[in-house]
UniProtKB/Swiss-Prot annotation:
Pfam families xref list: ig, Ig_6, TIR
Topological domains annotated Extracellular: 20-356
Every TIR domain range: 405-558
Organism encoding this protein: Mus musculus (Mouse)
PANTHER family per record: INTERLEUKIN-1 RECEPTOR FAMILY MEMBER, INTERLEUKIN-18 RECEPTOR ACCESSORY PROTEIN
Full protein name: Interleukin-18 receptor accessory protein
Length: 614
């Protein structure tokens, strides 16, 4: 279907080559004086935009009674720049379409003619590829006459290729005008790369200062006439800008060392990269030589490429290739030779057998070992308490044997709470001490605790009872809060500190139940104890479960006991401690936790009231 659509459009637009009526095309006559000394380049323009402007200007000058002529080209500027070229000999043969793979090159509306036929007249027609059927006059016909150049021996002939020196003054001459003695300074029309240069009307073009952008393809036109007709003489000159000669010897950029480590039996590529300063009349030379004892020979080049080229210098690389490095190559010398008109430079390189990379493996192994040590150290630092508890689990040592003490720990807490806290049923220090501590430390791990409100019969002397209980305990656990430090129970902490200074087996553990500020009335020893004694922080719901970090730290400070009855429970809960702490809202609460209609509501209430109290 797509092919049929193209065929239909081709017939509608009248794109058939045969029968193309070019009588309405704008006509130009050009003369090309061809020189037989070398291959010249000739250019034809297809400026349909200029034709459109000329017709529009002519139509604007008509009187109001005259009807304006139809615009010859109604397409956009982009459409008018995409043109198709045709050629026709003078004999009247049919038009021939110039394809893209023909000897004539097409670029941006220009046609480059490379192979002229002397003493011949050809017609070249161009028109847009995309046009409406009524644009029959949207075309340009150029009648080109090719003649050999006369007066070949005339002096000061302008070349079709001219060179300008950067940073200096210069001029561009029209080649066709230099040997035309019968033409006296005609008015010129100059083009550069297909664009009109309206500021230049004379020959030559004088330049006060030459820059890189001055190079390009220049076209010069001037008009000649006789009594019968007139025609345009055209010539093309290619202008190239160059810099001043750099009078320095070539510099070898690579190789930069005198030796190269290689592997025997492997292929090898040896590049020689050289920087040459610009020299107009000198050709750079790069060669590779091989020297062996008294013999020397040149090696064939595997590859040559130009790496960089500017108006000041150029970098060229020549490469040789060895299919296999042999033991004999280790005794040879490979010489890179570079030369210009100023002098030459050489670089000699020798091949050396590459040693085994034992050092690399040693370094890699050491680095891996160091990384392993650092990872192990970080693991031990983060899970040190868990590792210690694991060792205690399998260690047949019980430090409670023979110490003549009755309790593993004495728990001190505040049993006073404000009416506001009681109203919401918050998790108080008393609930933590009387419910959670027995469930975890006694029921799960087999420790024996002493709770004043549970295990001491009232009626004795309070101070004497406290001192007696602390002396019978291996540890002292103190739940700190604002009500504790500002209440009468702070005496128990003071008494324990005094006893710990005498009894080295008594160790004290502080639990920061919530944030508090030290009262000024605290004794000096108590203030100092708050700074030096180990402290474990209670974190609300995160600390409730027996596998939480809170209970792991408490067990770390508790005495070591060997109880086979509780070993399985301790190991199971201990392994949970290596995994990240989970959100305990989804876990089943301990039996000592207050129950409500649903477990989520009870635990959220505990977290909320705990934060409100502290």
């Amino acid at each position: 279907m797509l092919c049929l659509g193209w065929v239909f459009l081709w017939f509608v637009a009248g794109e058939k080559t045969t029968g193309f009526n070019h009588s309405a095309c704008a006509t130009k006559k050009l003369l090309w004086t061809y020189s037989a000394r070398g291959a010249e380049n000739f250019v034809l323009f297809c400026d349909l935009q200029e034709l459109q402007e000329q017709k529009f200007s002519h139509a604007s000058q008509l009187s109001p009674t005259q009807s304006p002529a139809h615009k010859p080209c109604s397409g956009s500027q982009k459409d008018l720049s995409d043109v198709q070229w045709y050629m026709q000999p003078r004999s009247g043969s049919p038009l021939e379409e110039i394809s893209r793979n023909s000897p004539h090159m097409q670029s941006e509306g220009m046609l480059h003619i490379l192979a002229p036929q002397t003493n011949s007249i050809w017609s070249y027609i161009c028109r847009p590829r995309i046009r409406s059927p009524q644009d029959m006059a949207c075309c340009i016909k150029t009648v080109l006459e090719v003649k050999p150049q006369r007066n070949v021996s005339c002096g000061n002939t302008a070349q079709d290729e001219q060179v300008l020196l950067l940073g200096s003054t210069g001029s561009i001459h029209c080649p066709s005008l230099s040997c035309q003695s019968d033409v006296q300074s005609p008015e010129m029309t100059w083009y550069k790369d297909g664009r009109l240069l309206p500021e230049h009307k004379k020959n030559p073009i004088e330049m006060a200062d030459i820059y890189v952008f001055n190079q390009g393809l220049y076209v010069c036109d001037y008009t000649q006439s006789d009594n019968v007709s007139s025609w345009t003489v055209r010539a093309v000159v290619k202008v190239r800008t160059i810099g001043k000669d750099i009078n320095v010897k070539p510099e070898i950029l690579d190789p930069i060392t005198d030796t190269l480590d290689v592997e025997l039996g492997k292929p090898l590529t040896l590049p020689c990269r050289v920087q040459f300063g610009f020299q107009r009349l000198s050709k750079p030379v790069i060669k590779w030589y091989v020297k062996e004892s008294t013999q020397e020979w040149e090696m064939s080049v595997f590859e040559e490429k130009r790496i960089q080229s500017t108006f000041k210098n150029e970098v060229i690389e020549r490469t040789i290739f060895l299919r296999e490095v042999t033991q004999r190559d280790l005794s040879r010398k490979f010489v890179c030779f570079a030369q210009n008109s100023i002098g030459n430079t050489t670089r000699t390189i020798r091949l050396r057998k590459k040693e085994e990379v034992v050092f690399v493996y040693i370094l890699l192994g050491t680095a891996l070992m160091l990384v392993g040590v650092l990872v192990a150290a970080a693991f031990l630092y983060w899970y040190w308490i868990e590792v210690v508890l694991l060792c205690r689990t399998y260690k047949n040592k019980d430090e409670t044997l023979g110490d003549k003490k009755e309790f593993d720990a004495f728990v001190s807490y505040s049993n006073w709470s404000s009416p506001e806290t009681d109203a919401v049923g918050s998790l108080s220090e008393e609930h933590l001490a009387l419910n959670l501590f027995p469930e975890v430390l006694e029921d799960t791990y087999g420790y024996r605790l002493c709770l004043l409100d549970r295990d001491v019969t009232p009626g004795g002397v309070y101070a004497d009872d406290i001192v007696s209980i602390i002396k019978k305990s291996r540890r002292g656990i103190f739940i700190l809060s604002p009500s504790y430090l500002n209440g009468p129970r702070v005496f128990e902490l003071q008494a324990a500190v005094n006893l710990a200074l005498v009894d080295q087996t008594l160790k004290l553990i502080l639990i920061k139940f919530c944030s508090f500020q030290e009262p000024e009335s605290l004794p000096y020893l108590v203030k100092k104890a708050l700074r030096v004694l180990p402290t474990v922080t209670w974190k609300g719901l995160k600390s409730v479960h027996a596998s939480s970090r809170f209970w792991t730290q408490i067990r770390y400070h508790m005495p070591v006991k060997n109880s086979n009855r509780f070993m399985f429970n301790g190991l199971r809960i201990f392994l949970k401690g290596f995994s990240p702490e989970k959100d305990l809202v989804t876990q089943k609460p301990l039996e000592g936790m207050p129950k409500s209609g649903n477990d989520h509501g009870a635990q959220n209430l505990l977290l909320y009231s705990d934060q409100k109290r502290c």
